[in-house]
């Protein structure tokens, strides 16, 4: 082989080596960095894609939940029509038979406009009497001497919705006409028990003809799903009721019940006096509804009630048909809850999104710092900014795009069915941010040559005019956002105002900018103090902290925003829990409450003794409650018609209860009356004046002078000695609290029990032995009744995830900030070890160096989080998020946002602990390595 051929082959190999793919070479050179970037992009893309899907999912589940648990009397759509007009009796009878009504029913269900969908199984049709008809049979029960009244209906598919308990299903024998005199019927078990009906019983129904219609009971049935729409839209079909008369004077009650006829017996009802009418009841099917269809659903329901869709229904059911429903009310209530929750959730999303963006930019800054020398060399050898940027873009895209796509797939798989495009937009935004920001930020650093080793620290940095203008702009936005949030709350005209939702982020950003400007001042003061002390470690650590690069400012920003978001989210969850606790306490007044109907039943002394002996009982406060006590008026002979509530208490035990619950605490001696208390059953002296505590409204009404009070507990004079806005015994706006020992007619009507781990079984047993009218309410059970709806639990889950993600990104920001300067600190330790620095001193040096920024971020985050909550609390109301379900959902008018100490302190302490841990680990790792590689000649670090 000739030398020439050898030289040509060598040149070809050299050219091949020079043209080696950049991306493949970089990935092989630094696989760990590429994997770390990919993992960060994966997690961030997953969060960005999962958030909109989670919101869609819990909003849709909340809508379905509201429609399913709603009373069918509000959610069912009922189509009614007048009975067939007078004319040929055969035609009238045919119009109400099952064949005709069933055909209309099927056409109505098939013609419902989307997204109104029917649950065909729970939907029903038939004919019913709209006016109850009195039954004159002597054997029927008459509690007040009044005849019971019965309604008659022919519900479709009765055997599919009920179980036959006795007898046989009612049928028709031959063809029933309008002149029929005998039909069969069934009744439910509850109706049979209440009215004394049994198989074979007959009821004579008056008609417009000469002979009555005889209805014979052939079967006793039990509903399969009593709470479903088939039985619960008209509860009279399954459950009879005692109804009061509407006449003046004391109410008299009579029974009202329903008899169930077979569908083809409907013509017989046309001759009765009960004003029969055909009906078609459409139970909504919520299984496929989504939150995006709420507006369309409301529009279609309105059209069905009075619009073009109603005309279509009239073409099927008759020109006078009408459709009635309260489904639009249910949708309005759902919209109100969603409008109250969505802006609060958006606050968490904006906060975490801002922190994630800052952390991604910090990652790019770390990569730029680590590759500064390499790219500077490329630039010095003729590399163009466009060429370098293109290679960095390709290198970043190879890692970021697949990671973002994988995060999107994981979010789609992990979160339930929802819209796809918001998730795609979120994951794409993360990929674009990484692919654009990282190469662009790295390339812009090499626009012009920079002097090697020039100082770039926070101590000597002088803010430019552009930075000052930008900071002032952010300040104006923050002030505007906070002012808007305080003035009109989180809701913005039914939508979400992102400027308002970004208020916590903007406050954190302003705080970061202020702290970055103030950072040199405490360092200078500390340096002067340390300079006078013995030893060089402290002074050297502060000097190193002062030389910290301005690139540490993004870390401070990320930490403050993350800590603010975590504090806000934790305070939201704590506020929800506090509101539910408060509502539970208002419902019971203590850990347990024992009372009769209307708090008016006197309790035997034995009940009080048995309750005191029950397990877990610490104290019992007997209370006498009387509602509707008239207040005196300044006009002679005129009294307050509404009255107030009189609460007779034992001052000692009741004052202790008020302090324990935090509701209207007061000193017990304020209720002590002068002189001897009247004996039981005796009239008090006319000159005796009882001190009372009153609500503000009642106190204003009574004034400061003694006033006469007339009540069932006695007639006496009272003087207001103090006011309390609330009291444990009653949850009313107006009340008077008086010493029960001073009342003439003393009796205990309510027991307020305090104690830990109360024995509910023993308390209920004691109450039952005292009488069946006494009931026991437990505070724990009232609290547990506030079960989260899917929308509430979804919003709380997002806030919990926001807290966790905020903490994770905050810790990652600390880690990235320390890793960015890790090579410089490692070289410093190597040089100082040659001067006699010990391992222990090295750990102290790195720990003290990391502490200023960590403490600044921790203390700043704690203060900023607290101040943010204080600033935004007037505009954030958590009552919808906390109390949209449960027995006391209207117990609180408002549930303000309150700072949660743990949510403020724990993340801040975590930042300090992580900074100290990373510094200790780095000192330990540097101590194990040799110093040769760190002491290379010409190294400028």
PLM-predicted stretches and their roles:
Residues 381-383, 403, 407, 836-837, ...:
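A short glycine-centered flexible hinge/capping loop motif at secondary-structure junctions
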Residues 4-9, 32-36, 44-50, 267-272, ...:
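Alpha-helical transmembrane segments, especially those used as permease/efflux helices
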Residues 396, 405-426, 488-499, 862-910, ...:
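Short helix-loop junctions at transmembrane helix boundaries
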Residues 488-680:
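Juxtamembrane segments of multi-pass membrane proteins
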Residues 133-195, 609, 618-619, 623-705:
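Short beta-strand boundary microenvironments
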Residues 1-25, 318, 614, 635-636, ...:
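Actinobacteria-biased recognition of intrinsically disordered, low-complexity terminal regions
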Residues 30, 358-397, 813-854:
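Interfacial "coupling" helices/loops that link adjacent transmembrane helices in transporter permeases
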Residues 1-354, 490-501, 514, 584-592, ...:
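Membrane transport/envelope proteins' first extracytoplasmic loop
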């Amino acid at each position: 082989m000739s030398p020439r051929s050898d030289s040509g082959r060598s040149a070809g190999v050299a050219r091949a080596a020079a043209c080696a793919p950049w991306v493949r070479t970089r990935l092989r050179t630094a696989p760990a960095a590429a994997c770390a970037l990919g993992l960060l992009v994966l997690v961030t893309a997953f969060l960005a894609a999962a958030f909109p899907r989670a919101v869609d999912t819990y909003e849709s589940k909340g809508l379905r939940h509201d429609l399913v648990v709603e009373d069918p009397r509000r959610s069912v759509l009922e189509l009614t029509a007048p009975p067939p007009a007078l004319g040929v009796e055969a035609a009238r009878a045919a119009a109400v038979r099952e064949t005709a009504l069933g055909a209309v029913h099927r056409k109505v269900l098939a013609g419902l406009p989307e997204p109104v969908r029917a649950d065909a199984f729970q939907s029903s049709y038939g004919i019913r009497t709209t006016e109850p008809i009195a039954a004159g049979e002597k054997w029927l029960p008459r509690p007040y001497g009044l005849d019971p009244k019965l309604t008659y209906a022919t519900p479709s598919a009765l055997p599919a919705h009920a179980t036959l308990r006795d007898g046989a299903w009612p049928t028709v024998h031959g063809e029933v006409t309008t002149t029929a005199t005998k039909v069969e019927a069934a009744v439910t078990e509850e109706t049979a028990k209440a009215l004394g009906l049994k198989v074979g019983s007959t009821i004579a129904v008056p008609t417009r003809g000469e002979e009555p219609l005889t209805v014979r009971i052939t079967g006793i049935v039990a509903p399969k799903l009593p709470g479903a729409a088939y039985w619960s839209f008209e509860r009279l079909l399954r459950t009879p009721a005692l109804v009061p008369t509407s006449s003046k004077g004391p109410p008299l009650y009579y029974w009202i019940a329903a008899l169930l006829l077979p569908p083809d017996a409907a013509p017989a009802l046309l001759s009765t006096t009960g004003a029969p009418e055909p009906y078609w009841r459409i139970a909504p099917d919520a299984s496929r509804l989504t939150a995006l269809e709420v507006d369309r659903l409301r529009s279609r329901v309105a059209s069905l009630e009075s619009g073009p869709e109603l005309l279509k229904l009239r073409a099927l059911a008759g020109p006078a048909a009408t459709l009635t429903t309260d489904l639009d009310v249910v949708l309005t209530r759902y919209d109100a809850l969603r409008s109250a929750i969505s802006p609060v959730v958006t606050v968490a999303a904006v906060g975490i999104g801002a922190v994630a963006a800052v952390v991604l930019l910090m990652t790019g800054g770390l990569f730029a710092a680590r590759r500064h020398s390499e790219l500077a060399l490329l630039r010095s050898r003729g590399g163009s900014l466009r060429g370098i940027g293109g290679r960095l873009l390709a290198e970043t895209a190879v890692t970021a795009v697949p990671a973002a796509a994988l995060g999107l797939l994981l979010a789609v798989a992990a979160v339930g069915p929802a819209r796809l495009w918001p998730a795609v937009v979120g994951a794409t935004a993360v990929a674009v941010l990484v692919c654009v920001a990282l190469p662009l930020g790295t390339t812009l650093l090499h626009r012009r040559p920079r002097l090697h080793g020039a100082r770039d620290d926070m101590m000597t940095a002088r803010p430019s005019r552009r930075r000052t203008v930008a900071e002032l702009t952010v300040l104006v936005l923050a002030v505007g956002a906070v002012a808007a949030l305080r003035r009109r709350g989180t809701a913005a005209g039914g939508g979400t105002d992102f400027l308002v939702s970004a208020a916590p982020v903007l406050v954190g950003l302003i705080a970061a900018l202020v702290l970055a400007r103030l950072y040199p001042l405490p360092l200078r003061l500390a340096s002067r103090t340390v300079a006078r002390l013995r030893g060089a470690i402290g002074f050297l650590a502060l000097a190193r902290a002062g030389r910290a690069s301005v690139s540490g400012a993004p870390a401070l920003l990320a930490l403050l925003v993350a800590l603010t978001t975590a504090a806000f989210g934790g305070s939201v969850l704590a506020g929800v829990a506090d509101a539910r606790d408060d509502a539970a306490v208002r419902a019971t007044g203590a850990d347990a409450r024992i009372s009769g109907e209307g708090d008016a039943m006197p309790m035997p002394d034995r009940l009080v003794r048995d309750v005191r002996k029950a397990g877990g009982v610490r104290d019992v406060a007997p209370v006498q409650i009387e509602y509707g006590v008239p207040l005196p008026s300044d006009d002679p002979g005129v009294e307050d018609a509404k009255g107030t509530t009189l609460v007779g208490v034992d001052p000692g035990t009741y004052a202790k209860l008020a302090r324990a619950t935090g509701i209207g605490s007061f000193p017990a001696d304020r209720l002590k009356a002068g002189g001897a208390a009247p004996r039981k059953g005796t009239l008090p002296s006319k000159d005796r004046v009882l001190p009372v505590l009153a609500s503000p409204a009642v106190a204003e009404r009574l004034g400061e002078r003694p006033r006469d009070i007339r009540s069932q507990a006695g007639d006496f004079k009272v003087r207001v000695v103090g006011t309390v806005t609330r009291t444990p015994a009653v949850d009313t706006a107006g009340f008077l609290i008086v010493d029960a020992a001073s009342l003439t007619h003393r009796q205990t009507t309510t027991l307020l029990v305090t104690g830990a781990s109360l024995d509910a079984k023993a308390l209920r047993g004691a109450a039952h032995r005292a009488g069946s009218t006494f009931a026991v309410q437990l505070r724990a059970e009232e609290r547990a009744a506030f079960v989260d709806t899917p929308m509430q639990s979804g919003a709380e889950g997002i806030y919990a995830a926001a807290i966790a993600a905020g903490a994770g990104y905050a810790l990652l920001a600390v880690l990235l900030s320390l890793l960015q300067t890790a090579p410089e600190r490692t070289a410093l330790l190597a040089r100082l070890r040659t001067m006699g620095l010990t391992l222990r001193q090295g750990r102290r040096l790195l720990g003290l160096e990391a502490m200023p920024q960590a403490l600044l971020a921790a203390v700043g985050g704690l203060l900023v989080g607290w101040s943010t909550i204080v600033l935004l609390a007037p505009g954030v109301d958590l009552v919808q998020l906390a109390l949209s379900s449960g027995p006391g959902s209207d117990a609180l008018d408002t549930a303000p946002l309150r700072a949660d100490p743990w949510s403020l302190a724990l993340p801040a302490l975590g930042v300090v602990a992580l900074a100290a841990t990373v510094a200790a680990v780095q000192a330990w790792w540097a101590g194990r390595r040799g110093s040769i590689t760190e002491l290379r000649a010409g190294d400028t670090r």
